[in-house]
Design a protein with these regions (language model features):
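Extracellular repetitive beta-rich solenoid segments
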Residues: 1-60, 108, 132, 192-196, ...
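Extracellular jelly-roll beta-sandwich "head" domains, especially the C-terminal globular C1q domain
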Residues: 57-219
Length: 219
């Protein structure tokens, strides 16, 4: 085997040697033309060209949180939470405000767009109440792959029991989505109740109806 031996002025050396087994073909590695920056590592493009690149830091690359701020009442109907001005990032104590981790979600008319391709965990929670009665409530995450046609991808089904006045309940659903096209892949949220009047408890100071988005991996 051949070695490239670099000898220090103090007498000791560092050697670069060939693989333990015979390569399947001749290999040529091309060194980069410039030094990298602190913390970078040398990587190959798969064809022998070497370059310096920053290594992933680990952990989440994006985390975002939005809440619905408006309380509203409806009877035996469906509402899509599509009022742009009723969605905000939490600005209460320790809230993210305008500072999501990484590049956050964008929202227009209650339709949420993703900042980049990847795997995202979506969590949607609601709070609601009814006076002197019981009813069924439903919450939904809907998704589109063509920026037009939406389908339900997650739902909760719950009954508010008539045990006191008012009667409260909370729901929680989640969905792991694989986003490959940020122009066409989007999500929105929907609430529904049967029968009597139900109040959906949006709030500008607390997360009562809220959505959390976590990017958990790249594609």
């Amino acid at each position: 085997m051949s070695n490239i031996k670099l000898v220090h002025s103090g007498g000791n050396s560092v050697s670069l040697t060939t693989p333990d087994s015979n390569p399947a073909a001749n290999r040529t590695f091309k060194l980069p033309g410039a030094d990298g920056t602190s913390g970078q590592a040398m990587v190959t493009d798969g064809s022998g060209a070497l370059s310096f690149a920053s290594m992933p830091s680990g952990g989440l690359s994006m985390a975002d949180n939005w809440r619905w701020t408006t309380e509203f009442t409806q009877s035996n109907t469906t509402s899509f939470l599509t009022t742009t001005s009723s969605w905000e990032r939490p600005d209460s104590k320790l809230g993210i405000g305008a500072n999501p981790l990484g590049t956050g979600m964008t929202q227009s008319g209650g339709i949420f767009s993703f900042p980049s391709t990847g795997y995202y965990l979506i969590h949607f929670m609601t709070s609601s109440k009814v006076d002197n009665d019981y009813c069924e409530i439903f919450t939904f995450i809907q998704a589109t792959e063509n920026n037009s046609d939406y389908s339900v991808v997650a739902r909760s089904l719950d009954t508010i029991q008539n045990q006191c006045t008012p009667n409260f309940t909370s729901t929680s659903i989640q969905y792991l989505t694989r986003v490959t096209n940020i122009s066409n892949h989007k999500v929105r949220f929907r609430v529904q109740n049967s029968g009597i009047s139900v109040t959906w408890m949006g709030n500008t100071d607390e997360n009562r109806i809220a959505a959390t988005f976590l990017k958990v991996g790249d594609i």
